[in-house]
């Protein structure tokens, strides 16, 4: 039985693509071990998947403050030492880095000890850990084109139920009436969307007003309900959406942030979007993610500092379904539906090469 060590953590944008690849290889009989931070999001998500875990306490490489800078060498040494111990214990056939700070100590130690290392960079701007590790990795892959010098563009792995949604033309057939708009704030919500969308809807005459499904995040659902009530508009307001594939499939337009996984899902489904990048993302990578779809005609890119109720209302009022169908098809044309397979295949090839 071959063993894959997945290194990923910090955000769902790193964790869920890693799970997609892990599941593909587990289905082929591989043993999966996950290296992450016991205090990170991965500690809440990964164990329920049934993977073995290898915890390493390691946090941000960058940050402000004298204490953080002074402690960085110590944190690096501790992280390297813990990762080294885990690698020697696990003895993986291949190490897969899917992003997040946790990939740095594990990736460096894997390269030092000669274990095959595959890197996958999800964002349009490579993170610090992957920029360093790309120089020592055996295979470098990316979710967007031209991210790292020697990276092969394979796309971002998405869940099978999302990748298998019907094509835009089939979904749009027979639709009529108000536009169907899906607003996605993510697990934590996006306060600016929660505040602006109901105000924008109130500016659109009732007969032209879109029907809205608005996902707010658990902590912001009460504030969202109050915002819709104050604006005098209605919507299907939810703290979370269980079936994202169905939600995407039913939408004419999605309003959301521009995380790498979100952009990959929008392309995989083939759905028009209005992307409002999170302005404080590291290296402003969400703007780059959004620009990729926008430049190919699949999305509108609206910086947060340009977002207000009047501007959003004007955009929504100007859209029609044929236009959104065309955007959906442009988005779908940028999809990489075999991304999971491509990353898994890279792991298999390196494992076979090591065996030989």
UniProtKB/Swiss-Prot annotation:
Molecular function (Gene Ontology), one example: undecaprenyldiphospho-muramoylpentapeptide beta-N-acetylglucosaminyltransferase activity
Give the record's GO CC terms.
plasma membrane
Q: Where in the cell is it found?
A: Cell inner membrane
- Do the record's keywords include Cell division? yes
Q: How does it sit in the membrane?
A: Peripheral membrane protein
Q: Which reaction does it catalyse?
A: di-trans,octa-cis-undecaprenyl diphospho-N-acetyl-alpha-D-muramoyl-L-alanyl-D-glutamyl-meso-2,6-diaminopimeloyl-D-alanyl-D-alanine + UDP-N-acetyl-alpha-D-glucosamine = di-trans,octa-cis-undecaprenyl diphospho-[N-acetyl-alpha-D-glucosaminyl-(1->4)]-N-acetyl-alpha-D-muramoyl-L-alanyl-D-glutamyl-meso-2,6-diaminopimeloyl-D-alanyl-D-alanine + UDP + H(+)
Q: Which keywords annotate this record?
A: Cell cycle, Cell division, Cell inner membrane, Cell membrane, Cell shape, Cell wall biogenesis/degradation, Glycosyltransferase, Membrane, Peptidoglycan synthesis, Transferase
Q: Report the Gene3D superfamilies cross-referenced here.
A: Glycogen Phosphorylase B (3.40.50.2000)
Q: Which Pfam families match?
A: Glyco_tran_28_C, Glyco_transf_28
Its EC number(s) = 2.4.1.227
Q: Describe its function.
A: Cell wall formation. Catalyzes the transfer of a GlcNAc subunit on undecaprenyl-pyrophosphoryl-MurNAc-pentapeptide (lipid intermediate I) to form undecaprenyl-pyrophosphoryl-MurNAc-(pentapeptide)GlcNAc (lipid intermediate II).
Quote the protein name from its UniProt record.
UDP-N-acetylglucosamine--N-acetylmuramyl-(pentapeptide) pyrophosphoryl-undecaprenol N-acetylglucosamine transferase
Natural source organism: Azoarcus sp. (strain BH72)
Which lineage ranks, top first, belong to the organism behind this chain?
Bacteria, Pseudomonadati, Pseudomonadota, Betaproteobacteria, Rhodocyclales
């Amino acid at each position: 039985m071959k063993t894959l060590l997945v290194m990923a953590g910090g955000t769902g944008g790193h964790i869920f693509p890693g799970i997609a690849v892990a599941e593909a290889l587990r289905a082929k009989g591989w043993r999966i071990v996950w290296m992450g931070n016991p205090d990170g999001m991965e500690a809440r998500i990964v164990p329920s998947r049934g993977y073995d875990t290898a915890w390493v306490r390691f946090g941000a490489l960058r940050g402000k403050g004298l204490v953080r800078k002074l402690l960085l060498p110590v944190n690096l040494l501790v992280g390297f030492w813990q990762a080294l111990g885990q690698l020697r214990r696990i003895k993986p056939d291949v190490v897969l880095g899917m992003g997040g700070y946790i990939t740095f100590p594990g990736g460096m130690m894997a390269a030092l000890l000669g274990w095959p290392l595959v890197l996958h960079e999800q964002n349009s701007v490579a993170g610090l850990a992957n920029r360093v590790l790309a120089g020592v990795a055996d295979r470098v892959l990316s979710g967007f084109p031209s991210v790292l010098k020697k990276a092969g563009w394979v796309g971002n792995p998405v869940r099978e139920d999302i990748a298998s949604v019907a094509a835009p033309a089939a979904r749009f057939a027979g639709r009529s009436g108000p536009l169907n708009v899906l607003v996605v704030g993510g697990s934590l919500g996006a306060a600016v969307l929660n505040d602006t969308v109901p105000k924008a809807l109130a500016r659109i005459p009732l007969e032209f007003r879109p029907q809205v499904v608005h996902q707010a995040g658990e902590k912001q659902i009460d504030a969202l309900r109050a915002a819709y009530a104050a604006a005098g508009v209605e919507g299907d307001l939810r703290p979370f959406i269980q079936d994202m594939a169905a939600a995407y499939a039913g939408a004419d337009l999605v309003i959301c942030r521009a995380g790498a996984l979100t952009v990959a899902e929008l392309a995989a489904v083939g759905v028009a979007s209005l992307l409002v990048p999170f302005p404080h993302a590291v290296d402003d990578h969400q703007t780059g993610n959004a620009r990729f779809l926008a430049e190919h005609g699949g999305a509108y890119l609206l910086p947060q500092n340009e977002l207000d109720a009047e501007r959003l209302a004007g955009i929504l009022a100007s859209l029609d379904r044929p236009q959104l169908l065309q955007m959906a098809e442009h988005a779908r044309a940028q999809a990489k539906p075999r991304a999971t397979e491509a990353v898994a295949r890279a792991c298999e090839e390196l494992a076979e090469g090591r065996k030989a």
